Amino acid sequence: MENKSPSKKNKPPSCGSLVTILSLDGGGVRGIIAGVILAFLEKQLQELDGEEARLADYFDVIAGTSTGGLVTAMLTVPDETGRPHFAAKDIVPFYLEHCPKIFPQPTGVLALLPKLPKLLSGPKYSGKYLRNLLSKLLGETRLHQTLTNIVIPTFDIKKLQPTIFSSYQLLVDPSLDVKVSDICIGTSAAPTFFPPHYFSNEDSQGNKTEFNLVDGAVTANNPTLVAMTAVSKQIVKNNPDMGKLKPLGFDRFLVISIGTGSTKREEKYSAKKAAKWGIISWLYDDGSTPILDITMESSRDMIHYHSSVVFKALQSEDKYLRIDDDTLEGDVSTMDLATKSNLENLQKIGEKMLTNRVMQMNIDTGVYEPVAENITNDEQLKRYAKILSDERKLRRLRSDTMIKDSSNESQEIK
């Protein structure tokens, strides 16, 4: 069986002092919010290291679920020059252009018709535009070709278990070296919104692996812990790229986790309201899909909770930054309202989130609370950008030193 190990250009953690992870939540059109924040972070890195700086240059792992998986691909798939296909500043314009075609809104008489019959007869959207778009943009690029390690969760409905597409996993399971476009289509196939994605992959020996995928959000809408686990497995397996890191050495991890907003404070549902719901009402209620909302919110919340506990236990809260907003209400809380006004409002929410105070989860109550220091998300991102820049420079310096020492040893042997 052909083993296509990932070949990344970034210097590994063994040359530095940290493992750097960027995690991107799912959320449909709300991915615009993450796009605004990522553009700000990349701009800070460019101010430190030059206009050619890209996020993929600074993170050992970029993880994304659903819409976050699409953004992950945009940031890590190479163009013809070997650099990222998209800069972070391109994400918001991309969403503004393509979301109305991915999530076409009914107009005229169709807008007046009930939506429920459509949902009962098939997915809300055909997904054809999204599939064609991703196939065109990402082409034949496969998982091993991304510019840094990526982790994208999906769920296989035939096997009834998660399928995690991880660059690291290719070392032991080459069957996962599929086209990145297929991964993105799979992780975006939200039940009731898009049809599941079927495809197969054949290795050099003719062995065929089939995939029957739906949205990774049913597995981990917030992929932070999935990414941390992927790295930890490599440490346990003594991957030389990890240097002397310990299996549970999360105090050496630097994690930026970006959400796409939630409706927790809106309190859309209640036991009293849902008491008489049957199957149909759980699938559709006033434009929302309650069962999907609950699944995704519980997933993202539990992962943030456990991540918070880990970093607090290690007294490393300053190495874990979660940027999110749980106050979304109305149109901006939906995953698929792709009207011009709603997309622009989501962009404004992202800009406002940058100026919000940094929040941490109270691990006793599960409630978001501002950190003791009066610091905003944009100020914290500037601090993280400096750490990322310094880490990259340290790795380059140590790598050059190791190469020089190795060369000197070779000369002495001769």
From Swiss-Prot:
Disruption phenotype: Decreased number of lateral roots. Expressed specifically in roots and root hairs. Residues 22-228 form the PNPLA domain. GO terms for biological process: defense response; lateral root formation; lipid catabolic process. Keywords: Cytoplasm, Hydrolase, Lipid degradation, Lipid metabolism, Phosphoprotein, Plant defense. It comes from the Eukaryota. Optimum pH is 7.0. A motif (GXSXG) lies at residues 64-68. One of its GO terms (molecular function) is phospholipase activity. One of its GO terms (cellular component) is cytoplasm. Pfam families: Patatin. CDD domains: Pat17_isozyme_like. The active site is at S66 (nucleophile), D215 (proton acceptor). It is found in: Cytoplasm. Phosphorylated at Ser-399 by CPK3. Phosphorylation enhances PLP1 activity towards phosphatidylcholine. InterPro entries: Acyl_Trfase/lysoPLipase (IPR016035), PNPLA_dom (IPR002641). Its EC number is 3.1.1.-. The nitrogen atoms of the two glycine residues in the GGXR motif define the oxyanion hole, and stabilize the oxyanion that forms during the nucleophilic attack by the catalytic serine during substrate cleavage. Belongs to the patatin family. Possesses non-specific lipolytic acyl hydrolase (LAH) activity. Catalyzes the hydrolysis of the neutral lipids monogalactosyldiacylglycerol (MGDG), digalactosyldiacylglycerol (DGDG) and phosphatidylglycerol (PG), and less efficiently the polar lipids phosphatidylcholine (PC) and phosphatidylinositol (PI), but not the storage lipid triacylglycerol (TAG). May play a role in root development. This is Patatin-like protein 1. It comes from Arabidopsis thaliana (Mouse-ear cress).
